[in-house]
């Protein structure tokens, strides 16, 4: 369902909200969990490290969405809606990890930060889904101004990667290559998710174990 066209001022406001969504993602879905991953590795906090490792496996779908949107592939808009939902679920789903985190002293900086981050990530997921859902109409009409707003950040990241790739390898990192890698990664992601849903979940339930 395509979003109704808005006046120029509202289109500018919509673009601002899109960029706000990307900035929130960079903070709560990328930057902070990366810091927590390194922090937990340095402190050798096994439960936190395992939670963050599982989170990054799930969060890779957001990177796949960026690759697909770089080349304006319609599927990227759908995965952009699904990704934050799975990411938020991944930090609350595991019963054993939840219990281990509850046992950690609240006054310690790392456990406290992880707990606050999980709530912040959940809030971001709600905002992100609400925003990305408005772009589902772009799966049929990707050339509108609203759709182009969602493509700006992926194309900006693509430009940086293209420059680095050319400098290091002397090759071309094109939008078509990015989309191809995105599709290949998506196939692997879906295969892994199905394997977990059909094989591992029925056997172990909500226990992370050594996953």
Features from the language model and the residues they span:
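Hydrophobic transmembrane alpha-helical segments in integral membrane proteins
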Residues: 4-32, 175-183
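Short juxtamembrane and helix-loop transition motifs at transmembrane-helix boundaries
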Residues: 10-19, 38-48
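N-terminal signal-anchor/start-transfer transmembrane helix
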Residues: 28-44, 193-197
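Juxtamembrane "helix-exit" motif on the non-cytosolic side of transmembrane helices
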Residues: 39-42, 65-73, 132-137
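Membrane-interfacial loop-to-transmembrane alpha-helix junctions, especially the N-terminal start
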Residues: 47-56, 209
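A generic, lipid-embedded transmembrane alpha helix
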Residues: 52-72
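Membrane-proximal helix-loop-helix units in multi-pass membrane proteins
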Residues: 77-152
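C-terminal membrane-adjacent module
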Residues: 120-211
């Amino acid at each position: 369902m395509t979003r109704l066209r808005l006046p120029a001022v509202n289109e500018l406001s919509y673009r601002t909200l899109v960029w706000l969504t990307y900035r929130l993602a960079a903070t709560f879905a990328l930057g902070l969990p990366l810091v927590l991953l390194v922090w937990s590795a340095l402190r050798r906090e096994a439960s936190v490290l395992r939670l963050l490792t599982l989170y990054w496996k799930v969060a890779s779908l957001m990177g796949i969405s960026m690759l697909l949107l770089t080349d304006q592939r319609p599927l990227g808009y759908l995965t952009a809606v699904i990704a934050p939902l799975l990411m938020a679920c991944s930090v609350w789903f595991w019963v054993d990890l939840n219990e281990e985190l509850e046992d950690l002293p609240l006054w310690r900086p790392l456990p406290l930060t992880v707990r606050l981050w999980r709530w912040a990530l959940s809030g971001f997921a709600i905002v992100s889904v609400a925003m990305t859902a408005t772009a589902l109409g772009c799966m049929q009409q990707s050339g509108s101004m609203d759709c182009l707003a969602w493509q700006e950040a992926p194309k900006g990241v693509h430009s940086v990667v293209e420059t680095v790739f050319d400098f290091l390898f002397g090759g071309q990192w094109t939008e078509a290559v990015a989309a191809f890698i995105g599709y290949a990664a998506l196939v692997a992601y879906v295969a892994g998710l199905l394997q977990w849903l059909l094989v591992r979940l029925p056997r172990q339930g909500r226990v992370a174990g050594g996953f």
